[in-house]
C-alpha cells in the first residue's frame, strides 16, 4: 500500500517573509528560479499521487514515469539548496539525512538501471550494478513467458541487489549477465514501488524541515 505524498500547501507562498520564500536569502534572479523549482516539485507530487491507483494494473510506462518524477523532485530540491545564500543554511541539519542518503543512493541506482543507462550501468557497485547486468525489459511477471530460460532470481532494495526469492514484488527487471554466463539466461530482479515513493517522501520532508528552519532561524539583520 502506497500512501499519498504530502503536498506543499503548508509552505506559505503568500508571504515573502516566511521560510523558503524569504526574498533576501536569494539573489534577485535566483528567487525566481526557486519559485520555478518549487512549482516543479509541486507538479511532480501531484502526478505521483494521481498515478498511485494506476500502479494496481501493470504498465511499464508508469514505472518510467514515476522514476522520472522522483528524479525531478530530487534535482529540484538540490537546485533550491544551490541558490540559497550558503551562509544562511550553513547550520541547517535534517534529522533523517542518513536515511535520505540511503534512499537517494538506491534511487540513483535504479534510475540508472531502468531509465538512464539500462545497457551500461557501471557506477553503482554497492547495489550490484557494476556493469555485469544489462536490463533488457520491465515486466509484471516472468510467468507470462514459460519458455524463457531463467537462471537466478534477485531483489533490488535499499540493501542492494541480493539473490533470493523475488515473489510478490511489484515489478520485475529482465536482465542478462555477459560475465556470469555469457548472456545465456535471464535474471529476474524484483523491485517495489514503495522504495521509489519513499525517496520522494524524504525529500519532501527535508523541504519542509528547510522551510521551518528558515522561518525560525534566518534573520536578515544577522547577515547584513
Locations of the language-model features?
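Short, contiguous, well-structured surface segments enriched in hydrophobic/aromatic residues
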Residues: 23-87
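Short acidic alpha-helical/loop segments enriched in Asp/Glu that coordinate divalent cations
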Residues: 83-91, 221-223
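Acidic, Ser/Thr/Gly/Pro-rich intrinsically disordered interaction regions
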Residues: 1-36, 43, 94-224
Amino acid at each position: 500500500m502506497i500512501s499519498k505524498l504530502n503536498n506543499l500547501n503548508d509552505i506559505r507562498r503568500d508571504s515573502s517573509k516566511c521560510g523558503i520564500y524569504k526574498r533576501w536569502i536569494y539573489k534577485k534572479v535566483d528567487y525566481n528560479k526557486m519559485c520555478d523549482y518549487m512549482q516543479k516539485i509541486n507538479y511532480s507530487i501531484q502526478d505521483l499521487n494521481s498515478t498511485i491507483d494506476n500502479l494496481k494494473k501493470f504498465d511499464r510506462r508508469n514505472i518510467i514515469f514515476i522514476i522520472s518524477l522522483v528524479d525531478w523532485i530530487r534535482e529540484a530540491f538540490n537546485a533550491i539548496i544551490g541558490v540559497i545564500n550558503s551562509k544562511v543554511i550553513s547550520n541547517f541539519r535534517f534529522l533523517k539525512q542518513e536515511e535520505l542518503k540511503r534512499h537517494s543512493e538506491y534511487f540513483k541506482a535504479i534510475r540508472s538501471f531502468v531509465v538512464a543507462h539500462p545497457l551500461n550501468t557501471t557506477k553503482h557497485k554497492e547495489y550490484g550494478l557494476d556493469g555485469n547486468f544489462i536490463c533488457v525489459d520491465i515486466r509484471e511477471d516472468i510467468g507470462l513467458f514459460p519458455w524463457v530460460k531463467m537462471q537466478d532470481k534477485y531483489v533490488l532494495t535499499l540493501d542492494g541487489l541480493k539473490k533470493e526469492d523475488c515473489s510478490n514484488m511489484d515489478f520485475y527487471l529482465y536482465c542478462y549477465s555477459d560475465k556470469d554466463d555469457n548472456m545465456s539466461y535471464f535474471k529476474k530482479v524484483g523491485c517495489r514501488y514503495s522504495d521509489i515513493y519513499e525517496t520522494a517522501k524524504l525529500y519532501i520532508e527535508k523541504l519542509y524541515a528547510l522551510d521551518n528552519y528558515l522561518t525560525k532561524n534566518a534573520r536578515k539583520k544577522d547577515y547584513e
